[in-house]
A protein has these predicted regions:
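Glycine-rich anion/phosphate-binding loops
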Residues: 1-9
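An alpha-helical appendage that flanks or caps ligand/catalytic pockets
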Residues: 37-72, 113-236
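Loop-centered beta-sheet repeat module
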Residues: 78-124
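Structural motif
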Residues: 13, 98-99, 237-238
Length: 266
């Protein structure tokens, strides 16, 4: 309910452009030493409660995970903010298609799209919803900079958090032998992330280059055209939006997106 009030406040300040993603907690329960509990049920209940609250409705909820008694934000006005459910797997996607305005995928890669979009279609049909009314957003890393090597170094540094570098994320881009090297050296990627270094010890540069290409948008301005083609492929598959994760020097990154990337997408 605090999320609901916060995003409603943002929505009012932003003239109806507010939005929020509610997920199952990601890595945070593990970091905090907490049990993940009923992630799908809890996330679905949270999304449903927030949806009611941001519309100014009375929230009376007696769920398996959350409970509320007669909560109401009487001050909200205008078009409600967009409420996404963060989801990648089939159960979370089913929940998202039931309760949310849309879903945000995390680091979705092209080889995953056919199966994932199948889950979306199944969920929408199951819950009697139209695809045109459901937003599909892919969260992806944007590292494009004026200096190509700086961009690639940053992308290598952040690689461990691309799907937490689990096998389904890296195996499609590597040979079995290369995938085995990555699987045996995940700690090197974590060390690079923690020390803010682009040096992945024990992993050949050519393997790192394949991962950067497959799991992020990196390079300089000359690389934008091929990244645009990838984004268009996502769009053709049904993705309606992309959330670009910025890193170092976000001001310059925003300028690159506005002045260089968006004109290419139009």
């Amino acid at each position: 309910l605090k999320i609901a009030n916060a995003v409603s406040t943002l929505n009012e300040f932003a003239n109806g452009r507010g939005m929020v993603v509610i997920g199952g907690g990601g890595e945070w329960p593990g970091i905090l030493g907490m049990d993940y509990g009923k992630r799908v049920t809890g996330c679905g209940e949270a999304v449903a409660m927030v949806k009611r609250a941001v519309a100014g409705e009375v929230v009376k909820w007696d769920g398996e995970v959350y409970k509320a008694r007669y909560f109401q934000s009487t001050w909200v006005k205008g078009t409600p903010p967009i409420i996404y459910a963060g989801a990648n797997g089939p159960k979370m996607i089913d929940m998202a298609t039931r309760f949310a305005d849309g879903t945000m995928f995390s680091d979705m890669i092209l080889p995953m799209l056919p199966r994932t979009m199948g889950y979306v279609r199944e969920g929408l049909a199951k819950h009697g919803r139209e695809a045109r009314d459901f937003r599909l957003n892919n969260f992806c890393a944007f590292h494009v900079k004026d200096d190509r090597e700086v961009s690639f170094s940053e992308a290598r540094r952040e690689m461990i958090i691309r799907g937490w570098l689990e096998a389904p994320w890296y195996e499609p881009f590597l040979t079995p032998e290369e995938a085995a090297i990555v699987g045996a050296n995940k700690h090197a990627f974590l060390t690079a992330f923690r020390t803010r270094s682009g040096d992945i010890k024990g992993v050949p540069p050519e393997i790192c280059a394949k991962l950067v290409e497959g799991l992020s948008l990196a390079g300089d301005l000359h690389d934008l055209d091929r990244h645009v083609e990838r984004l268009r492929t996502f769009a053709a598959a049904g993705i309606t939006e992309n959330a670009l994760r910025l890193h170092d020097d976000p001001v310059r990154a925003i300028h690159i997106i506005g002045k260089e990337l968006l004109p290419r997408l139009r």
